[in-house]
Amino acid sequence: MSADSIRILTVCTGNICRSPAAERLLAAGLGDAAQVTSAGTGALSGYPMDAAMVPLVEAAGASTDGFAARQLTPAMVKSADLILALTTAHRSQAVRLAPVAVRRSFTLLELARIVGSPAFPALTTESVSDRLREMVQQAAPRRMLGADGVVDDDVPDPFRRGPEVFMSSFVMIRDAVDVIVDAVH
């Protein structure tokens, strides 16, 4: 991680399925440009990533080593340059902990939809970390970009559900991460 790395925080409920998958995929895709962590609004603190999510994340080329769930705190939200929640409810909970973070808080799917829109401006800064910062600044006033009609920006919680739900949630996360990573590379 470089000195100018952007701090990204991913948030879900238990911090064992969705947010750790997003964390590890973003970390793999962004490398030293970002310090990516995750936390849960009702975390199963200390637990590893759910066993059903591990092979999906690893097959995508990201490491699951050393992961332990953490409870979301106001300090985490305040210190993050970008908060990526897995549902709109998680985003609301994070912003309630630190209202100052509202303009840098998105759902993962929302940010991918915004930056993936043809109307989103090209990012022009030099480094990947600077392009990530520029992306956050450009995305905040464009929250409805690409939202044609009713938009569901939530990734379903696969916890204690079947492998099909894990795969569906994982694919949504992976595809959104790919859009975000591609936008800054």
Predicted features and spans:
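Phosphate-binding/catalytic loops
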Residues: 95-185
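Short secondary-structure boundary segments
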Residues: 87-88, 109
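Conserved active-site segments centered on acidic
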Residues: 1-82, 88-101, 182-183
